[in-house]
Structure formats: structure tokens, C-alpha cells
Amino acid sequence: MNRLALYCRPGFEKECAAEITDKAAALEVYGFARVKENSGYVLFECYQPDDADTLARKLPFRELIFARQMLVVGELLKDLPPEDRIAPICGMLLGVVEGGGELRVEVPDTNESKELLKFCRKFTVPLRAALREQRTLLRQENPYRPVVHVLFIAPGCCYVGYSYSDNNSPFYMGIPRLKFPADAPSRSTLKLEEAFHVFIPADEWDERLGSGMRAVDLGACPGGWTYQLVQRSMMVQAIDNGPMVPSLMETGQVTHHRADGFRFTPEGDNDWLVCDMVEKPAKVSALMARWLVNGWCREAIFNLKLPMKKRYEEVSQNLATLAQVLKENGINAQIAAKQLYHDREEVTVHVRRIWGAIPGRRDEREFRRREQRD
């Protein structure tokens, strides 16, 4: 198995291919990407044996922007016999994976492939039993062992492979299953909820998304992102010249400032800054840098709207510029970006300041005083 399969949003195969080619080369792994437009996945074929496994282990999945999932696969299995689809799949995995912890029978995220989902769910049960019988899978699921993947791209045609549980997406098809809240102001609320799932480890939610925290939402109207912050019992300053939905204002947790998000200056410190404004990505990232450099927030989640062409290059340049500005100002920060399932022509970025790395900075001293006061 010397191919890497990467799931992505249909229409972004070229961006996904450009990214994996760049990231692989940085690890001195070389190959070429096979791209089929609107297929929802990309194949990266490595020139050297075992290089796909090297990428699956050493290339941090969290650093990939356009990939929803990353796995090692073999040759395409074609024309699986309807009377026995299981034997060829088991044969390809025999001796490749031992003691896998989970089986996922998946499809690309396309309208055509979704017709196969019902089959995949039914097929999973007998296939899992057969793989356990030959010890490719453990008898019980184990979240710390490799995940076995079967990716059906058409009836009777699939790629078979595996991913490492500590370097993949934990979600089926790489997509978190979120339910739209009936009382949310807009569907954009799911973007921020998904961002929390992707960027913030579940065991850190109470600490980093806790009750009573202070947050600012730039470009808040009508309140989709503010809704998520309110649900986490935060106190929110909503910045927008437009109206907020009355239900959010009635909570008593939201203060609405009718102001331009690019001109607003907070009076105090904040734990969170979120921003989903429709503006050029360079302008938004510069605004985020200003907030972080001035110590106006600890963490930020924001969207960068993508141009029609050179989308990977545009995002890479904006992230590099942001990182450089923070570095020049003595800010030690973690930066991550991902095109989420609920994103469209955009990517979502998360920045977290690393506290204690820059002792004595003005903003750190102010936070320490506030913590002592509280």
C-alpha cells in the first residue's frame, strides 16, 4: 500500500492535492497527486515503498487545511463479486493491519456516493465479523489502535486501507454529526460548533470554553456565532451595525454594540474572539493579529473567505503573514486552520496564545491581575 487517500470537500480537490504535495515534500517524501474534479477525494501516489505509511505517521493531520481524513490505501478493488465482496477486501488487508481498533466503511461526500451509504451500513456488520476472524480487527473496538477504512467510490469499487488513531479525524467520513438547534438564529452557528469540536480537545472544553468567560463576536448579526458562546454560558459583546435576534438579548449575557467590527476597540480583556465577517482574507487576518498582539483575547476563531483562484496559495500566505506578525511582536501562539464541513468558500482558523512563554508582557500582566482580582 503506497498511496495516501485524502477526503475533501467536493470542488477543492486541487487545493487538497497542492497541499499534500507541499507537505510531503517538506518531509522529503515525493510522489504525485491524482485528482478527479468534484470527486470528494484525492490520491497521492508515493514513489518509494512505505512512504505512504511514513506520511500517515509523521505528517500531522491537524496541519492539513483541506483534508477531512487521511489514510493509507492500496490498489483500487474493481468489480467486487456480488456473491462475495468480503474475500477480496480481507485478502488485501491480511498481513497489512493486525489488531485494528475500528472499521469504517465510507463513501466520498458527493450526492452520487450518498446512495451507497445504506449499503455501507449493512455491509459493515458481516465485514467486521470476517476481519475479526482473521485478526485484522480486535474482538472489541479500541480507540488507540489503527482504524481500518473501506472507501467505496462506486458500486463494487473500493479502496481499502488504514489510518492511525492518533493522527486522523475521529469522525466517520471526517464529518462531525451536528444537529442544527431549532432556536439558533442562523445555520452559521454550526460552523463555530464544529470548530470547537475540531480545534478544542473534548477534555479541555470546561477549562477553555467555560461558564463566565468573556467573548467578543465581530460581525455578530444576527447572532449565529454568539448563540454558541451563550450556550457555553459566556458573557458576550456582539459587535455589528445590524440587529441581533431578541432571544439572545433576552438572556442577559449579550451586550450589543452597534459599531464597525474593524474599528471596535474593547475596554477590557477577553478570553475569546470570534469573527465571521465577509471581507478580504488579508484584512481579516490583519485584524486578528491586532487583537492578539494587543492582548485583547486569549484565543480566536475566525473565517477567511477564499478567492475563486489560487485558494491554497492565498490561505497559506495569510497564515504565514499572521504567524510572522505574531512572532515579530513576541507572541508565542498555536495556529491551526481547517476547511470545515459547514464551511463553503472559506476556511476556519484557530489561534491560541501560549501563556507564560513571554514573561512580563503588558497583556500577560493584565490577565494575571484580573485572575488575582477574580
From Swiss-Prot:
S-adenosyl-L-methionine keyword on record: yes
Stated family: Belongs to the class I-like SAM-binding methyltransferase superfamily. RNA methyltransferase RlmE family. RlmM subfamily.
Subunit record text: Monomer.
Reactions catalysed, as given in the entry: cytidine(2498) in 23S rRNA + S-adenosyl-L-methionine = 2'-O-methylcytidine(2498) in 23S rRNA + S-adenosyl-L-homocysteine + H(+)
General function of this protein: Catalyzes the 2'-O-methylation at nucleotide C2498 in 23S rRNA.
Record organism: Edwardsiella ictaluri (strain 93-146)
Active site: residue positions: K305
Protein name per its UniProtKB record: Ribosomal RNA large subunit methyltransferase M
EC number: 2.1.1.186
Gene Ontology annotations of biological process type: methylation; rRNA processing
NCBIfam families per the UniProt record, alphabetical: PRK11760.1 (NF008734)
The entry's keywords: Cytoplasm, Methyltransferase, rRNA processing, S-adenosyl-L-methionine, Transferase
Lineage, uppermost ranks: Bacteria, Pseudomonadati, Pseudomonadota, Gammaproteobacteria, Enterobacterales
Amino acids binding S-adenosyl-L-methionine: S188, C221, P222, G223, G224, D240, D260, D276
Primary localisation category: cytoplasm
Subcellular location(s) per record: Cytoplasm
Enzyme class (EC, first level): transferase
Keyword Aminoacyl-tRNA synthetase on entry: no
Entry GO terms, CC: cytoplasm
A GO molecular function held by the record: S-adenosylmethionine-dependent methyltransferase activity
